[in-house]
């Protein structure tokens, strides 16, 4: 679309783990450098003074100039779309784990405090689809946001040195998991199209809300597993820098590198569409090449 040259969404923060692990597996620092650059730019351009975030920052793909800041899946451009806040919390917590860069821990803590202290967070701690949306008895919740938040908060609680703050983060995660594990959010076996959780919001402006989502179930299970490991006194996340001692490991890594390198390089250079055309089934002409 015209004047929408390089769209960057806050959701991308959770994907940076792939780049950090790829650097560890290939001993090539360029992937980690890309992850750091992306995270630092997100802090600078996506986040507001209160540590809420825009959903979208639209850049000029040639100059890097910011064209606009928007919240396409939220209530308004200036609102705090709940899942976007959760993605940011998860992503910066992960980036601290992978880099031990204090900037990312600081950012994650600020985001967590923004969410934890937000006056619109309901008593059961399952957020409305947007923290700034008008609240009525029919305002949709987003269980997926709570799942992502809980998983991130469990890990973040292990990084924070202040025991009071650490316990507050863990308590919020426990409250969210307790709410998610019973009605009205937890579905009965065989119901809800066999999804575990009800009442997520994929995209309220597009009319997709009060629905199950596969990533809600995924992060719910991840959060439960992390909580179990925490109670057992084990690290909540295994930080692995090698796949295994399997004899085919080098083949896997070289194949991954061969596939990923041109995609990542062209994406970073803004030449993906030109050099790596693709075919899409989307009805949106902007998604077809």
Question: What is each model feature region?
Answer:
Residues 1-289:
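Glycan-recognition and catalytic cores of secretory/periplasmic carbohydrate-active enzymes
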């Amino acid at each position: 679309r015209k004047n929408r040259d390089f769209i960057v969404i806050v959701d991308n923060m959770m994907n940076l783990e792939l780049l950090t692990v790829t650097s560890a597996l290939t001993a090539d620092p360029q992937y980690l450098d890309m992850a750091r650059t992306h995270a630092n730019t997100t802090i600078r351009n996506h986040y507001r003074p209160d540590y809420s975030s825009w959903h979208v920052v639209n850049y000029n793909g040639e100059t890097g100039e910011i064209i606009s800041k928007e919240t396409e899946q939220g209530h308004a451009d200036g609102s705090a779309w709940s899942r976007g806040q959760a993605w940011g919390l998860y992503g910066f917590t992960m980036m601290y784990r992978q880099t031990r860069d204090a900037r990312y821990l600081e950012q994650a803590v600020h985001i967590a405090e923004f969410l934890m202290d937000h006056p619109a967070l309901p008593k059961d701690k399952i957020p409305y689809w947007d923290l700034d949306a008008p609240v009525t008895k029919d305002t949709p919740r987003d269980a997926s946001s709570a799942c992502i938040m809980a998983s991130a908060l469990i890990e973040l609680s292990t990084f924070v040195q202040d025991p009071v703050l650490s316990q507050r983060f863990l308590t919020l995660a426990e409250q969210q998991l307790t709410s998610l594990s019973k009605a009205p959010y937890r579905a009965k076996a065989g119901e809800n199209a066999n999804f575990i959780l009800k009442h997520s919001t994929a995209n309220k402006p597009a009319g997709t809300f009060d629905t199950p989502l596969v990533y809600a179930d995924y992060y719910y299970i991840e959060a439960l597993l992390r909580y179990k490991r925490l109670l057992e006194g084990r690290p909540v996340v295994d930080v692995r820098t090698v796949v295994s001692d399997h004899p085919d490991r080098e083949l896997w890594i070289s194949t991954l590198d061969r596939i990923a390198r041109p995609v990542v390089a062209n994406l970073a250079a803004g030449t993906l569409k030109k050099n790596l055309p693709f075919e899409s089934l989307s009805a949106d002409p902007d998604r077809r090449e």
